[in-house]
Amino acid sequence: MEIPAALKRAALALIAGAIFAAVPHAQTQQQGGHPGRLFPPSDLGLLDAPDRDLWQRPDQIMDALGIADASVVGDIGAGSGWFTIRLARRVGPRGLVYAEDVQKEMINAIQRRVGREGFSNVKAVLGRENDPRLPASSLDAVLMVDAYHEVEDRVTMLSNLAKALKPQGRLGIVDFRLDGTGPGPAPEERVSPDVVVSDATKAGLKLIRQEPFLQYQYFLIFGK
């Protein structure tokens, strides 16, 4: 029995629609992460796990980025302020830390923590989606720890971070490896370092080096 031409066209349209519908999903899987899905403020306590100093190695990260006394630095997606206070201690009273987050609850938590611990060299910044609202050409280093997989428009965010760096400034991105180890997000929510490098290249940044010393994470350092 011959199939009517109209029915053939309808079947082909359904097949084509299914194929095109699958493309964004495949791209999402390839890119990794769940862009726009933010860390819930109700889980802030998880960011201050007692053993985090052991596997996060904040001093080595700051050393690798050249963060020292009087440095001006940014903590992007600062969350509970765990890294913020360590940066503030490192740069001292002559330095400045911009602690940025896009969630007001996080900014409030950072301000409480900074006040409780007596730091006067931290400025909390409520960023916009894909724009941390940092002053142009003013930062020696910018650090984004365990937050890259949450960013919705990564190239735009990286472009804005690049604008905030001084000519010789450095951007450090730390996020969890794809093997699923460690205390980070589920494997399907993680982002490949190759994707980060590709995004950074599109944003006009260059990979300087990759540091291998973290137990569960990769650490990429970029410059202009």
What residue spans do the PLM features occupy?
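Bacterial N-terminal signal peptides
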Residues: 10-22
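Class I SAM-dependent methyltransferase SAM/SAH-binding core
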Residues: 74-132
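Conserved class I S-adenosyl-L-methionine
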Residues: 107, 170-197
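A short acidic, Gly/Pro-enriched loop at the edge of an enzyme's catalytic core
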Residues: 130-142
